[in-house]
Every structure is written in C-alpha cells, then in structure tokens.
From Swiss-Prot:
GO cellular component: cytosolic small ribosomal subunit
Subunit structure: Part of the 30S ribosomal subunit. Forms a bridge to the 50S subunit in the 70S ribosome, contacting the 23S rRNA.
Organism from which the protein derives: Chlamydia pneumoniae
Protein name: Small ribosomal subunit protein uS15
InterPro entries named among the record's database cross-references: Ribosomal_uS15, Ribosomal_uS15_bac-type, uS15_NS1_RNA-bd_sf
The keyword RNA-binding is assigned to this record: yes
Described purpose of this protein according to its UniProt entry: One of the primary rRNA binding proteins, it binds directly to 16S rRNA where it helps nucleate assembly of the platform of the 30S subunit by binding and bridging several RNA helices of the 16S rRNA.
PROSITE patterns assigned to the protein according to its UniProt record, in alphabetical order: RIBOSOMAL_S15
Gene name of this polypeptide: rpsO
Length: 89
C-alpha cells in the first residue's frame, strides 16, 4: 500500500520550503505521516496482517529519525512541523 501520485504532490506542495523542494525533511516527514495514517486504518480492518504491522513500525522509526534530525538542525522548523502535522507535544 502506497500513496498515489496526486496525494504525494499535494503533500509536497503544502510542506515544501521552496518551489522545487521535493525531498526536504519536512516533505519526507509529511509523506511518511500520511502513509502511517493509511497503514493504521488498514490495520484496524485487518489486525492479523503482520507484514503491514512490521511496515508500519519501520515507517514510524524512519519518521522518528527524520524528526530527530530536523530537531537537531533547525528547532524552529521542527516545532512548526510538529504543530502543522498535529504530532506530539
């Protein structure tokens, strides 16, 4: 299960830092967050799907690493992103 192209483009436009930004930490975290939300919904319907559960854990770890990186490099952007994505704190 992956995000369709239109959804990724929409998220990219919403979180990009400049016009041609497609891979900044902000954009990657936003895309991962959407993918995690979709997987969580899938797991509610299919609780025995262990491959999807492992994929979810992997994505959460990946997002956590990117959030730690963003926090260490630019705390203000980190706090702004956490607020915009309605993540913890």
């Amino acid at each position: 299960m992956s995000l369709d192209k239109g959804t990724k483009e929409e998220i990219t436009k919403k979180f990009q830092l400049h016009e041609k930004d497609t891979g900044s930490a902000d954009v990657q975290i936003a895309i991962l967050t959407e993918h995690i939300a979709e997987l969580k919904e899938h797991l509610k319907r299919s609780p025995k799907d262990q491959n999807s559960r492992l994929a979810l854990l992997k994505l959460v770890g990946q997002r956590r690493k990117l959030l730690e990186y963003l926090n260490s490099t630019d705390t203000e952007r980190y706090k702004n992103l956490i607020t915009r994505l309605n993540l913890r704190k």
